[in-house]
Amino acid sequence: MIAAEQKKQIISNFARKAGDTGSTEVQIALIDARIKELNEHFKSHKKDFHSKTGLLRLVGKRKKLLDYLKRTELDRYKKLIETLGLRK
């Protein structure tokens, strides 16, 4: 799990205004942090297939949110991709 301080940091970095916790950018950034954390977990726990299922769900959810953002706000999408270092 992501630590509370780390979560607050991510929210403050990607929030569009003060108190924004549900914008698409914030959701994608939080999911991305969880995905990176799970990838580190799999380096030492190669046979954890149950968690791998959860990882695939998170990747799918992130992809859907990215597609939505690309469809609605292309400029914000490009900025987010660059900030998070995702390939697209």
From Swiss-Prot:
Entry's Gene Ontology molecular function annotations: rRNA binding; structural constituent of ribosome
Pfam families cross-referenced by the UniProt entry: Ribosomal_S15
Q: Which SUPFAM superfamilies match?
A: S15/NS1 RNA-binding domain
Which UniProt keywords are present, listed alphabetically? Ribonucleoprotein, Ribosomal protein, RNA-binding, rRNA-binding
Record's GO cellular component, any one? cytosolic small ribosomal subunit
Enumerate the Gene Ontology biological process terms. Answer: translation
Output the NCBIfam families linked to this UniProt entry: S15_bact
Q: What does this protein do?
A: One of the primary rRNA binding proteins, it binds directly to 16S rRNA where it helps nucleate assembly of the platform of the 30S subunit by binding and bridging several RNA helices of the 16S rRNA. Forms an intersubunit bridge (bridge B4) with the 23S rRNA of the 50S subunit in the ribosome.
Q: Which HAMAP family match?
A: Ribosomal_uS15_B
This protein's assembly is summarised as: Part of the 30S ribosomal subunit. Forms a bridge to the 50S subunit in the 70S ribosome, contacting the 23S rRNA.
The UniProt similarity line reads:
Belongs to the universal ribosomal protein uS15 family.
Matches recorded under PANTHER family: RIBOSOMAL PROTEIN S15, BACTERIAL AND ORGANELLAR, SMALL RIBOSOMAL SUBUNIT PROTEIN US15M
Name under which the protein is recorded: Small ribosomal subunit protein uS15
The record lists the organism as Leptospira borgpetersenii serovar Hardjo-bovis (strain JB197)
Organismal lineage: Bacteria, Pseudomonadati, Spirochaetota, Spirochaetia, Leptospirales
